[in-house]
């Protein structure tokens, strides 16, 4: 991997980044309470959002639909704000309140109609957005996790999302009779689960990767699907909660590559997984056969001596956000 651009400008740690699915836009968020938006064609700064939050902006997510770009920001001030571009100006559209503590993650459904938010208050809220992005109605409050919820991630093409928690589990959620329910409780990690990401594939095969404080990444597969080794001996299924629940198995554990907590994981359309974390390493894995993963490349000290908080794919490039306040772009 080769570093091709270092985006500097944040004055505190860079927490996360979000790549717009259709437009050449990258948003980064920081402990300096701001969000910076870049044009990914030339890496020029488009705008900086400096208002709306009085504590760290911990998470950022582009809405995947709509006639003009808009994004959600989740903050340690316990609120979520919605921003959008109107008449060539970036404007504040809505404030979403409900969580009692820091908002750790925000994620949009594939159709852009729903927004999931998660918090240190152990809850996940699901919000329904109107077409103008200025009215948000809470349609479900999910309190199955027993600890801080670190991350939420929707599937890129299906109406299902996953959550990762300090309670060492990943949970899968689907809609049922106008409410959202937990359909799987994945309990394979031995410590905090910091992040998770779905495989961005079409069709029936559902897979998810999760990363943890236990220094491992686990690939999960929805049971009953075609593929895999066919031998699940020694692989325990996830706990099944109720008759509507789904059974997921641990298909693989990625090769050990990290020496400290793994904070973030990302899966791209070409089948590669990237991970990063407290040891400052950036690692890319590829799958040689069903459930057979190898390390393809890695970078030590991707942000110098600093921890790396987040990794996302930008086509075949990688975007990492570090405690040094820098957002790095990597050619893989």
Curated annotation (Swiss-Prot):
<feature type="repeat" description="WD 4">
    <location>
        <begin position="144"/>
        <end position="183"/>
    </location>
</feature>
<dbReference type="InterPro" id="IPR036322">
    <property type="entry name" value="WD40_repeat_dom_sf"/>
</dbReference>
<dbReference type="Pfam" id="PF00400">
    <property type="entry name" value="WD40"/>
</dbReference>
<feature type="repeat" description="WD 5">
    <location>
        <begin position="188"/>
        <end position="230"/>
    </location>
</feature>
<keyword id="KW-0677">Repeat</keyword>
<dbReference type="InterPro" id="IPR001680">
    <property type="entry name" value="WD40_rpt"/>
</dbReference>
<dbReference type="InterPro" id="IPR028608">
    <property type="entry name" value="CIAO1/Cia1"/>
</dbReference>
<dbReference type="GO" id="GO:0097361">
    <property type="term" value="C:cytosolic [4Fe-4S] assembly targeting complex"/>
</dbReference>
<keyword id="KW-0539">Nucleus</keyword>
<dbReference type="InterPro" id="IPR019775">
    <property type="entry name" value="WD40_repeat_CS"/>
</dbReference>
<protein>
    <recommendedName>
        <fullName>Probable cytosolic iron-sulfur protein assembly protein 1</fullName>
    </recommendedName>
</protein>
<feature type="repeat" description="WD 7">
    <location>
        <begin position="302"/>
        <end position="332"/>
    </location>
</feature>
<dbReference type="GO" id="GO:0016226">
    <property type="term" value="P:iron-sulfur cluster assembly"/>
</dbReference>
<dbReference type="InterPro" id="IPR020472">
    <property type="entry name" value="G-protein_beta_WD-40_rep"/>
</dbReference>
<comment type="function">
    <text>Essential component of the cytosolic iron-sulfur (Fe/S) protein assembly machinery. Required for the maturation of extramitochondrial Fe/S proteins.</text>
</comment>
<keyword id="KW-0963">Cytoplasm</keyword>
<feature type="repeat" description="WD 6">
    <location>
        <begin position="257"/>
        <end position="295"/>
    </location>
</feature>
<feature type="repeat" description="WD 2">
    <location>
        <begin position="52"/>
        <end position="93"/>
    </location>
</feature>
<dbReference type="GO" id="GO:0005634">
    <property type="term" value="C:nucleus"/>
</dbReference>
<comment type="subunit">
    <text>Interacts with NAR1.</text>
</comment>
<feature type="repeat" description="WD 3">
    <location>
        <begin position="98"/>
        <end position="137"/>
    </location>
</feature>
<keyword id="KW-0853">WD repeat</keyword>
<comment type="similarity">
    <text>Belongs to the WD repeat CIA1 family.</text>
</comment>
<dbReference type="InterPro" id="IPR015943">
    <property type="entry name" value="WD40/YVTN_repeat-like_dom_sf"/>
</dbReference>
<feature type="repeat" description="WD 1">
    <location>
        <begin position="9"/>
        <end position="48"/>
    </location>
</feature>
